[in-house]
């Protein structure tokens, strides 16, 4: 099972959209593909269960049958930073539980995409961040860059942090989130020249996002490694 961690330059920059697009791309190619989002905020009660809209989208596009609590073991109702939610609910993240789920997925999937919450450096608890989670899982990263004014600074700082931690950046996706952004092409060209990892694609601004439509702009073959990690 090839496993990748999807992180981003910020919150609300389309990580779930790109995660779903990657899953859609590979399911259309005949692979068994699933997604996971270990931590989700802004959840709501549906049919007596806490659920995240992001997690629902991931489950809907995946073509493997997985329990929703395995896709998303930590759900919080308030749309606030996760370390605050963990503290308010007196919870700690259990990396062994997440690894247990990953091992259980191994015989069900060819590919698994794990979506983080917020940006790369966001704290999950007071002493444990998304970056720490990636390190603990020891899996390569696909970075989603939300292309808007200021994205160059966000992207370069995030890439610098990833590389300083000696983590593997397998590729990145430019996701246009501002349809009125000036000099869009020039910004993406600069990022392609300065991010030392392959650009898997530049997804245009799509008012009504469709993962299958967006997947046409992504080239999975450009990933610079395929390590069977789980």
Please identify what each model-predicted range represents:
Residues 125-148:
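Inter-motif core of Ras-like GTPase G domains
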Residues 1, 31-32, 107-110:
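Short, high-confidence coil segments that cap the C-terminus of an alpha-helix
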Residues 5-19:
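Glycine-rich phosphate-binding P-loop
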Residues 17-92, 96, 101-103:
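N-terminal phosphate/diphosphate-binding loop that engages ATP/GTP or pyrophosphate donors
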Residues 159-230:
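C-terminal lobe/tail of nucleotide-utilizing enzymes
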Residues 5, 113-115, 142-144, 173:
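Structural motif
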Residues 58, 98, 102-125:
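Switch II (G3) loop of P-loop NTPases
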């Amino acid at each position: 099972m090839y496993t990748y961690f999807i992180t981003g330059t910020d919150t609300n920059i389309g990580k779930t959209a790109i995660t779903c697009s990657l899953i859609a791309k590979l399911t259309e190619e005949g692979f068994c593909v699933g997604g996971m989002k270990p931590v989700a905020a802004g959840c709501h009660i549906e049919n007596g269960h806490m659920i995240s809209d992001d997690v629902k989208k991931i489950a809907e596009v995946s073509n493997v049958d997985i329990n929703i609590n395995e896709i998303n073991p930590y759900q919080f109702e308030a749309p606030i930073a996760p370390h605050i939610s963990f503290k308010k609910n007196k919870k700690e993240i259990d990396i062994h539980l997440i690894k247990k789920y990953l091992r259980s997925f191994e015989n069900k999937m060819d590919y698994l995409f794990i979506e983080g919450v917020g940006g790369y450096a966001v704290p999950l608890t007071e002493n444990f961040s998304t970056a720490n989670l990636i390190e603990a899982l020891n899996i390569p990263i696909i970075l989603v860059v939300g292309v808007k004014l200021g994205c160059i600074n966000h992207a370069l700082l995030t890439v610098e942090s990833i590389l300083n931690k000696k983590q593997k950046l397998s590729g990145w996706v430019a996701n246009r989130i501002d349809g009125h952004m000036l000099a869009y092409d020039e910004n993406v060209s600069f990022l392609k020249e300065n991010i030392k990892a392959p650009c898997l694609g530049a997804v245009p601004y799509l008012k009504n996002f469709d993962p299958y439509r967006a997947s046409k702009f992504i080239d999975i073959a450009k990933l610079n490694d395929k390590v069977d990690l789980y």
